[in-house]
Design a protein with these regions (language model features):
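A short, active-site helix/loop in glycosyltransferases that binds the activated sugar's phosphate group
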Residues: 138-143, 164-209, 217-221, 227
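Conserved donor-binding/catalytic core segment of Leloir-type glycosyltransferases
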Residues: 237-255, 261-264
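Short alpha-helical donor nucleotide-sugar binding micro-motif in glycosyltransferases
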Residues: 310-315
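Aromatic "clamp/platform" in nucleotide-sugar-dependent glycosyltransferases that forms part
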Residues: 323
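Conserved acidic donor-binding segment of nucleotide-sugar-dependent glycosyltransferases
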Residues: 355-356, 360-367, 376-381
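A short, well-ordered alpha-helix in the C-terminal region of glycosyltransferases
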Residues: 382-397, 406-409, 413
Length: 422
């Protein structure tokens, strides 16, 4: 079986990381998988880039300009809205024509347009689409932030100036997606049960096939290491508790840095000795902009996977207070290294963290509870038992083998359904 995974980027962003890991999982379990991207970042021969042209850059810039115009030239929500009006026709590429299954991943920001997806469907090839956020099920947003207008027809979008109108951009794109999905059979996959529930509530997904399969992780790469050696490689203190925060852009409001800072402030007020025995490591872009009441280490953005694994293994606790998230790769990476995680009860996070078994699930936006969770992991819990529970959870749910088998089943069903329809 030949599978072509289509994603905007090869490595940048959580969806790209997940798509890359899925490709590896499939290739290690009997499937011939390749990845087609716009932004190729390595020399990996299983990853193919779109033919280089000025058109690729134009597609990206033109769509961002259109979004900028619809936002009345405000940058505030510029990266929260996608229209899929610009893209590249991939159906003539050799990799497309050789594939048995076309697997769409995160295809926004000028990679594929809705017209391009319609052409993919019309090619007759089975199409599987993994949802890394809610965008395929809404008009224009990736995360609904409590809005449920996508249950019917979108419109009056809270992301648009003055909350849009009944027939605004979100309503128009919603209708285009509805026509697209109605005309073609797509097998949708969500990475979390939370996202599956959200998607099933969409007016776009009435009668659609939706399966829940988590993202995989290579447990031969993300695995426990000696903490003292890991800290030496990461340049972190050997004699402190270390709390880790990781995000591609740590100042991203959705990742909850404000709540992390407030929780740390509460901990320091409650336990002043933490100033002497605890440090914080922050991994990700803009980490130097964060000010904390505990000694902190700004690790900036790191691309070297071995260094990232060393940083995880340096930590005693990993904290991700996301306000909305699907199935965060960072929590999976932390757990695969045997490091317990603390996060809010939101999105797919409670599916990953089993409360007080392999980490701590705090009440949503409750920084007092978040602080209690951090302290519980550092000072009260059985650390060895937590570590073992983390490793067991990952092995049972997120291993390459377990995830690959589930996707192979989806591919076989999609091919059988397509043949039946023909």
């Amino acid at each position: 079986m030949r599978v072509l995974i289509v994603n905007t980027s090869e490595k940048t962003g959580g969806a790209a990381v997940a798509a890359n890991r899925l490709m590896d999982a499939l290739n290690n379990n009997g499937v011939k998988a390749k990845m087609l991207v716009r932004d190729k970042e390595t020399e990996d021969i299983t990853v193919v880039s779109l033919p280089r042209s000025l058109r690729l850059q134009w597609n990206f810039l033109w769509e961002r300009w259109c979004v900028f115009w619809h936002l009345h030239f405000s940058r505030q929500r510029l990266w929260e809205v996608d229209m899929a009006t610009s893209g590249t026709d991939i159906t003539r590429l050799r990799e497309f024509q050789e594939a048995d299954v076309i697997h769409l991943s995160w295809i926004n920001q000028g990679m594929l347009s809705l017209k391009n997806i319609r052409k993919i469907i019309r090619s007759g090839k089975p199409v599987v689409w993994t949802m890394h956020d809610l965008w395929p099920a809404t008009g224009i947003c990736h995360y609904a932030r409590g809005c449920n207008r996508y249950a019917s027809a979108c419109g009056n979008c809270p992301l648009l100036p003055n909350k849009g109108s009944k027939n605004d951009l979100s309503a128009k794109i919603f209708r285009r997606k509805k026509e697209l999905y109605h005309r073609g059979a797509i097998s949708f996959v969500t990475c979390s049960r939370w996202l599956e529930r959200q998607a099933k509530g969409s007016g776009l997904f009435v009668g659609q096939r939706i399966t829940n399969i988590p993202n995989p992780i290579d447990t031969h790469v993300f695995c426990p290491q000696d903490q003292a050696e890991a800290r030496l490689r990461a340049g972190l203190p050997a004699d402190k508790h270390i709390i880790l925060f990781v995000s591609q852009r740590v100042t991203d409001e959705r990742k909850g840095m404000r709540y992390f800072i407030e929780a740390i402030d509460r901990l320091v007020a409650r336990y002043p000795e933490m100033k002497e025995n605890t440090s914080i490591a922050i991994l990700g872009g803009h980490s130097e902009e964060v000010n904390l009441t505990l000694p902190s280490y700004s690790l900036s953005y790191v691309s070297d996977e071995k260094q990232i694994v060393a940083i995880y293994n340096s930590a005693d606790a990993f904290v991700l207070p996301s306000l909305e998230d699907n199935l965060p790769n960072t929590i999976m990476e932390s757990m695969a290294c045997g490091v317990p995680s603390i996060g809010f009860r939101v999105g797919g996070i409670p599916e990953m963290i089993d409360h007080q078994q392999n980490g701590y699930v705090a009440n949503y936006r409750d920084t007092e509870d978040l602080a209690s969770g951090i302290h519980w992991v550092l000072e009260e819990a059985d650390r060895a038992a937590l570590k073992q529970a983390c490793l067991q959870k990952v092995a049972q749910n997120y291993s390459q083998y377990a995830v690959a088998l589930k996707y192979i089943e989806v591919y076989n069903e999609a091919m059988a359904y397509k043949n039946y329809k023909l």
